[in-house]
Design a protein with these regions (language model features):
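Flexible glycine/acidic-rich beta-alpha junction loops that bind and position SAM and/or redox cofactors
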Residues: 11-20, 112, 154, 209, ...
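N-terminal [4Fe-4S]-dependent radical SAM core
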Residues: 2, 143-146, 152-200
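Radical SAM [4Fe-4S] cluster-binding motif and immediate context
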Residues: 176-341, 348, 353, 358-361
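Short, solvent-exposed turn/loop segments enriched in Gly/Ser/Thr/Pro and often Arg
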Residues: 39, 54, 105, 253-260, ...
Length: 476
């Protein structure tokens, strides 16, 4: 077995772009998702090492210090971070001439040839679900025999092997939490709406929804929700509860954990027996009966992608959600005492000044506890990217998804709505949602009830206002 380094490379200060972040950008407040995609394959390679640089405040010099310890380096990359990640790979190769190094992630899965052509020092890239592709490299198998691999042969020519079949039995994958225990400091991972410290993991891959903007189902996970067995999930939570007694919350980061409702309820009941607090992603259509089962068995929070308050925009992006159903679902959650973190996207196809106003009013009406407002990001490999090129919504001048400091930009524009108008609407959205007497009172009440929460919210407040000031500087 090759001595293998799995690396989420150093990047922008505070850049949440790891192998677990759906939107790669510097957040409004300090936030880091776990590098779960890398941890999963690290668990398949005995003796490997996982380094998640940014949350652990590691710079390039820290990584290079041990470069000669490894035979193989596997870096996770993304469209926004690719140029920076290539420079890190080149530095690793300069420090260890015998090192084989390559990339995994959605960026290289959909653009394997172009990615390899960016630097002759990139030895390989892996497509879609790369777990067993990388394991076979680490085992020393001939690269020409490994499905799902694109690579540079001994002559320097680029070769593309047949794609790897998507994994069907998710219980074949080992637990990720032992890798967290071995290689990560979990206190370094923050998500503003989750308790701290938290742990996130997947209980399945894929999503049956067809949202045009969503990256993973269109590039690496597919549109069939493939799940781990209930017993397998519960066994990992049981392990993690003992391995990390300090953890206050578990988060299931499947694209839509609630799609299989009988399974959701079965897992909930088992978690209830364990007595753990947990949260998950959900679509805004979960029946009240299922919500009650979840709530009664330890569910605290749902992360819900509302995206827009305009029904036509939801049709345009194939969200498969009705505004009236979302309203009823949200009302049920409020009545059951389930906290909601709502996410919204501005700049989607069909957006106008009027629909932005409609979405802001919708968010204020349904009133989730906290929100995230993102900008529509046309990642290569998505339907949104194809549409943007076809209709001229994306131009070279504004094609970057982030600015040089890692802040998310507004790459799309429309004949009736400019990049700048879309970008500036994010700040307006946040101000009009949070700067209301009831919302301010709720935050103060939360702080008064918990000294730990008071310290945390004060820190987040400082970071949030600094973020808004930074956005204003970008505009001016």
């Amino acid at each position: 077995m090759m001595r293998t380094l799995f690396l989420q490379a150093p990047s922008f200060e505070g850049f949440d772009g790891g192998a677990g972040a759906r939107y790669q950008a510097r957040r409004e407040i300090r936030s880091f998702w776990y590098p779960t995609w890398l941890a999963q394959v690290a668990a398949l390679v005995p003796g490997s090492k996982l380094i998640d640089a940014t949350p652990h405040r590691l710079g390039l010099s820290d990584i290079l210090r041990d470069a000669r310890k490894y035979d193989l380096a596997v870096l996770h990359t993304s469209t926004p971070s690719f140029a920076s990640d290539v420079r890190v790979l080149e530095a690793l190769k300069a420090a260890n001439a015998d090192l084989k190094a390559g990339f995994v992630g959605a960026k290289v899965a959909v653009e394997p040839h172009a990615s390899l052509e960016c630097s002759r020092l990139i030895d390989f890239v892996a497509g879609n679900e790369f777990d067993f592709t990388i394991k076979e490299i680490a085992q020393g198998r001939a690269w020409s025999d490994i499905t799902g691999l694109s690579y540079r042969d001994k002559t320097g020519a680029v070769r593309h092997n047949p794609p790897r079949a998507i994994l069907q039995n998710m219980d074949e994958l080992p637990f990720v939490t032992p890798i967290y225990k071995r290689d990560l400091t979990i206190e370094n991972y923050f998500i503003g709406y989750l308790k701290h410290p938290y742990i996130s993991l997947y209980t399945g891959r894929g999503c049956k929804s067809r949202c045009t903007f969503c990256l993973w189902p269109q590039t690496v996970g597919g549109h069939r929700y493939r799940t781990r067995s209930v017993g397998n999930v519960v066994e990992e939570i049981r392990f993690a509860r003992h391995a990390f007694p300090q953890v206050k919350e578990f988060f299931f980061d499947d694209d839509t954990f609630t799609d299989d409702r009988p399974r959701t309820e079965a897992i909930a009941r088992e978690l209830g027996r364990l007595g753990v607090t947990w949260s998950c992603n959900a679509k805004a259509n979960v029946p009240r009966e299922t919500l009650k089962v979840m709530r009664d068995n330890g569910l605290r929070l749902l992360l819900v992608g509302y995206e827009s308050g305009n029904q036509q925009i939801l049709h345009n992006i194939r969200k498969g959600m009705r505004i009236d159903v979302a309203r009823r679902f949200t009302k049920d959650c409020h009545e059951l005492g389930i906290t909601i973190h709502g996410t919204f996207i501005l700049g989607l196809p069909g957006e106008s000044r009027e629909t932005i106003e409609e979405t802001i009013r919708f968010a204020r009406e349904i009133n989730p506890h906290t929100i995230q407002v993102s900008l529509a990001a046309p990642y290569p490999g998505t339907e949104l990217y194809r549409e943007a090129l076809e209709h001229g919504w994306l131009d070279e001048v504004h094609a970057e998804l982030i600015d040089p400091s890692g802040v998310q930009m507004a790459p799309l524009h429309y004949p009736h709505l400019s990049h700048t108008e879309i970008f500036q609407s994010v700040e307006e959205f946040y101000r009009r949602f949070y700067f209301r007497a009831p919302k301010i009172a709720a935050i103060i009440s939360e702080m008064v009830c918990s000294p730990q929460m008071m310290v945390r919210r004060l820190r987040e407040g400082v970071e949030f206002f600094a973020f808004l000031r930074g956005r204003q500087e970008l505009v001016h």
